[in-house]
Amino acid sequence: CIAAHTMGTNGNSVQVQYWTGSAWADLCPVTAVTSDEPIMVIFEPETRQRWRISITGGTAPEVGVIKFGTAMQMERPIYGGVAPIPMARQTILRSNYSETGEYLGRVQQRSYLSASYSWQHLTSDWVRANWPDFQRATEAEPFWLAWRPGTFGDVGYCQVDEVPIPSNMGIRDLLSVSMSVRARGYD
């Protein structure tokens, strides 16, 4: 996963590679980066000690965050009610007016992305096996979130203001969990 970068602006291409012990092997094809949105490369698990990101073309980019790790796939998908993170823009504006009420202008104080996710009917076994590690990780640092990565390329480099806590649904051993995330804007 890569975030806080300028590879789209700089016209770069990216490729993920790992060391086999004698040479670098390609994990994915060279891919042109078309925006400065966060990037998530999903692949079959590999146990390797050395990884690298090969960046080619364009001018030298700035890259703020790179992480390798195991992606947690939710037990059940979310089908509706989700605002695509790139379109969930929240902008705080400050307008200025004259003494007589005439509009003088506006400044943008900050902009970020904000979305909410809610999963239902998660089995107790799955939640107990997978959620505690994720929950602790959200307390410590931002994380990447991809909604339906096989269909859409929407990826957010997110953080939570409140730790997401699963709750019993009252149906057999099923739980639900919701979280509101704030993501870094990239423009």
Regions found by a protein language model. Name each.
Residues 13-17:
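Beta-strand signatures of extracellular beta-sandwich domains
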